[in-house]
Amino acid sequence: MMLATFSTEVQTVIETIRTNLPYILMMAGVLYAMHIFNWFVGYRLNQYGIVPRRLRGLPGIIFSPLLHGDFNHLFFNSIPFVILACLLSLYGWPVFIYASVVIILLGGFATWLLARNGSHIGASALIMGYWSYLLVFAYYQPSWLSIVLAVVCIYYFGSFLLNVFPRSAKSSWEGHLFGLLAGLVAAYTSPYFSIAWSNFLASRA
């Protein structure tokens, strides 16, 4: 009986990934479309990344995940983005959107407030947030699914942790660090969001 239930749950996970993957790929497609346009205009859009402690850098909190330095930068971000976004979407689209908003806004604002001067761009901070969310959510809400997702993140993406340390002048390690920390906050607050969202839907019924 337990084996049959587990098999059914695994099949549900597989079907959910199949359903969600096209939408995740569309999001990745937006990144590529933005980058092609940015390349066409000589990467002028990169000035609209997060510029720390400058008012003109505040919009970059929203736009920086869409901007990349070159096609290699985008390619090596898009692969983990698709994988981790698919895994996170298994918790449902409301949770996915909530986590994404928290990571982008909180991680981006911390980068704007505390990072080095320059224009901080790239989706890697968002990716780091997804990674840390999937890791610690297994602690806050343990289940076979959350534990499996955490193990996958550790096994295949454990080296991500090195990204929070200064390794290259061109790499925004601050963005990686604050994205990771924002993911922790999103994971901790996510159960409260889920309760509030359920109550909201119930009140509209």
Which residues are covered by each model-predicted region?
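A detector for small-residue-rich transmembrane helices and their helix-helix packing motifs
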Residues: 3-205
